[in-house]
Structures are given as C-alpha cells and as structure tokens.
C-alpha cells in the first residue's frame, strides 16, 4: 500500500514542499532565512490576532487600549512586545535573505525574485501601518510625513493624500482604515509566500557555488528540517532576549506620548528598518525627486536579473564583485545611521554621498566589475 503522505491530495502538496523535496546537498546557513521568515510571519499573525482582540482603532481610545493591553491583559505586555520586536526580527531576516539572493545570484530565478520584491513592499507597507496604530507622537507624525509624500505626485497628489487620509488631516478615519489594512495585508502576504514557493519549487533551490546541482540532491527532511530547527532556536532565543530584557531598545521614546497634532516632535524618524530608505529620501532636496528615489531604492532590486553581466552566477568565485558587494553592505549601514541623525551639516553631505554610492554600485559598478572579471577569466 502506498504511503498516504504521497497519495492524499492535500498532504502530498505538503510532502512535495517540505518533506520529499529534493534540495542541494551544499546549501549553507544563509538558506535558513526562508524558513525563519515563515516563522516570523506566523509569530506576527498570532500575536497580532490576540492584540486585535483588545485594541480599539479610534483616536480617543487607541493609545489607552495599548496601555490596557500592557497592564491589564494576561501576558498582554509579552504579546505586545513580541509583536513589536518580532517586526524587527522579521526585517533582519528579510535583509539577510535578500542579501543572500544578491550574493549568490538567486535573482536569476526571476519570477521567484520579483515576487520576493513585491513581498518586501507588502511587508514594509504592513509594518508602516502597524507603527501608526498605537497612536503615539511618532505614530501620528510618521503617518503624516510619509502619507504627505504622495502629494508630490503631479496633478492628483493632493486629492490622493486627502483620499487616503479620509479627511483634511490624519485623523480617526485614517487610523481605522490603517487598522483594517494592517489586519488584511499579512494574509495577502501568506498568499504571496505560497506563490513565491510555487515558483521556487519549479526550479529548485540555488546553492553557494551557483552551479546546477540536479545530480546531487538530498531530501529536505530530515537534513534541512533539523538544520532549520537550529535557526529557529537562535531566532526565538534572540527575540525573547530582546522582549524580556530590553523591549524598548529599538522603539522611540516619543511613542510613549499620546499623539498631539499641535506639537511636532524634534526629530521625526521611522523605525530602524526604514532608516536607509528615509536617508535616501532626505538626501534629495526636491520633494518629487526624493519620493522617486525612495521608491526606486527598493524597486531597483527588480533590475538585478537584467544587470547580471557575469558569466558566473554566484559571487563565490568572484573576489572583485565580493569586494563591491561588501562596500554596498557598508553603505547601507551608513545610510541607516544617517537616517536616524538630524538634518545638519556633516550628515547631509554624508547622506547624499551614500545615496549616490548606493545607486552607483547597483547600476554601474557591479555590472562593470562583472565584465572585468569575465575578461580576467580569459587570461
């Protein structure tokens, strides 16, 4: 009799995705982040669901409902801080996952890659709207500043902003719709993740060498299930250490002050995971130019398959490209730092130079270096 695992219409899909899936024998720990992102998504949906049971999306009661969750709900403080810091862990895993794809040339699976970029946009939108919900000072002013950027769109800008706000300023209508979108988007993300995996399993995983590994595959279970468990343990350990020892480490103290439209905080800045994009936005003195640079800073990822001029897929055997890649990583750290600084003399020029370098590396330097390496192969 054939195993139910292999014949049952529903179970066999799970079997082909997570159990009998042929996987390359040499994928490193950098391939753990896919499963860790899945875990982060599950944690966020579950903690978010329990928070939604106690949260009220009204300007008068939103801030106090979050306080109520932390003080009066059983383990409410734990659920709230797991959700807030879970978002940070989510983005750490996301950035490492995307960085892995860039380094090892995984973007040559362009359907998988492009859906991944759409997923990145969806997660960023979800995180932004979630940050508005506690209705603290930074929530309110962050929402005001970021939604206001849409007014830079010619002709329809102002109308569009007022349509999104549901009035002439960020108010109760904005908060209610942000809560609705923040609730629905993770489920859309789950659907996109399934499509992401569907396309990935059409081709199979890439591996560090970038070479075809069809001749040397091993079953996903038990080899990579046990390997993923190590990643899960490290992720949960890090998350719980953050939640239990310094839950407000990555937050902004201004968000413990209820939203007040009459008083602007001295420095409006987003959560740490948006700072690099915020720095690029601020580095351009023109409003529309800044908005375009902001959008293009993420959208540029979609160009990676087109900009790949090397004869080799992975950077494993390309020392010059490796060097440029790590300069790009350093540049992103610099942008993140600048995004959190006030708009003053040394920071403005550093931000502008770092922004130029970011686009130059991706659009010019990496493709040029790839071509040089192709020439060196002939020597």
Swiss-Prot record:
Domain of life assignment: Eukaryota
Tagged with keyword Membrane: yes
Subcellular location: Mitochondrion inner membrane
Keywords for this protein: Electron transport, Heme, Iron, Membrane, Metal-binding, Mitochondrion, Mitochondrion inner membrane, Respiratory chain, Transmembrane, Transmembrane helix, Transport, Ubiquinone
Amino acids binding heme b b562: 83, 182
Necessary cofactors: heme b
Molecular function GO labels: metal ion binding; ubiquinol-cytochrome-c reductase activity
Residues bound to heme b b566: 97, 196
Cofactor note: Binds 2 heme b groups non-covalently.
Coiled coil location: none
Ranges that cross the membrane: 33-53, 77-98, 113-133, 178-198, 226-246, 288-308, 320-340, 347-367
Record-linked InterPro entries: Cyt_b/b6_C, Cyt_b/b6_C_sf, Cyt_b/b6_N, Cytb/b6-like_sf, Cytochrome_b, Cytochrome_b_C_euk/bac, Cytochrome_b_N_euk/bac, Di-haem_cyt_TM
Binding site for a ubiquinone: 201
GO cellular component, one term: mitochondrial inner membrane
Assembly description: The cytochrome bc1 complex contains 11 subunits: 3 respiratory subunits (MT-CYB, CYC1 and UQCRFS1), 2 core proteins (UQCRC1 and UQCRC2) and 6 low-molecular weight proteins (UQCRH/QCR6, UQCRB/QCR7, UQCRQ/QCR8, UQCR10/QCR9, UQCR11/QCR10 and a cleavage product of UQCRFS1). This cytochrome bc1 complex then forms a dimer.
Other comments on record: Heme 1 (or BL or b562) is low-potential and absorbs at about 562 nm, and heme 2 (or BH or b566) is high-potential and absorbs at about 566 nm.
Role, per record: Component of the ubiquinol-cytochrome c reductase complex (complex III or cytochrome b-c1 complex) that is part of the mitochondrial respiratory chain. The b-c1 complex mediates electron transfer from ubiquinol to cytochrome c. Contributes to the generation of a proton gradient across the mitochondrial membrane that is then used for ATP synthesis.
Family: Belongs to the cytochrome b family.
PANTHER family tied to this protein: CYTOCHROME B
Name used for this protein in its record: Cytochrome b
């Amino acid at each position: 009799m054939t195993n139910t695992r292999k014949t049952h219409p529903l179970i066999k899909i799970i079997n082909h995705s997570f159990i009998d899936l042929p996987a390359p024998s040499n994928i490193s720990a950098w391939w753990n982040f896919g499963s860790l992102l899945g875990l982060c998504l599950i944690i966020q949906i579950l903690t978010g669901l329990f928070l939604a049971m106690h949260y009220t999306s009204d300007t008068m009661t939103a801030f106090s409902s979050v306080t109520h969750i932390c003080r009066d709900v059983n383990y409410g403080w734990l659920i709230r801080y797991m959700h807030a810091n879970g978002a940070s862990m989510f983005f750490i895993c996301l950035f490492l996952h995307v960085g892995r794809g860039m380094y090892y040339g995984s973007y040559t699976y362009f359907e998988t890659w492009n859906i991944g970029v759409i997923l990145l946009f969806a997660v960023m939108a979800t995180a932004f709207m979630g940050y508005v919900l506690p209705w603290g000072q930074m929530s309110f002013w962050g929402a005001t500043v970021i939604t206001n950027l849409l007014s830079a769109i010619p002709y329809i800008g102002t109308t569009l902003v007022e349509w999104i706000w549901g009035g002439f300023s960020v108010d109760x209508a904005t908060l209610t719709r942000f809560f609705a979108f923040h609730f629905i988007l993770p489920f859309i993300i789950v659907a996109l993740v399934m499509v992401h995996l569907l396309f990935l399993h059409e081709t199979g995983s890439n591996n560090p060498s970038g070479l075809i590994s069809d001749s040397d595959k091993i079953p996903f279970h038990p080899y990579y299930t046990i390997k993923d468990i190590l990643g899960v343990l490290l992720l949960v350990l890090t998350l719980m250490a953050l939640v239990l020892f310094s839950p407000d480490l990555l937050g902004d103290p201004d968000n413990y002050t209820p939203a007040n439209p009459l008083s602007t905080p001295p420095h409006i800045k987003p959560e740490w995971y948006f700072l690099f994009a915020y720095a690029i936005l601020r580095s351009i003195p023109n409003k529309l130019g800044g908005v375009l640079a902001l959008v293009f800073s993420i959208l540029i990822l979609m160009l990676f398959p087109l900009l790949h001029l090397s004869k080799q897929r992975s950077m494993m055997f390309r020392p010059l490209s490796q060097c440029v890649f790590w300069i790009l990583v350093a540049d992103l750290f610099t942008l993140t730092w600048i995004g959190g600084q006030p708009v003053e003399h040394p920071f403005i020029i550093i931000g502008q130079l770092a922004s130029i370098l970011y686009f130059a590396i991706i659009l010019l330097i990496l493709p040029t270096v790839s071509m040089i390496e192709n020439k060196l192969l002939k020597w």
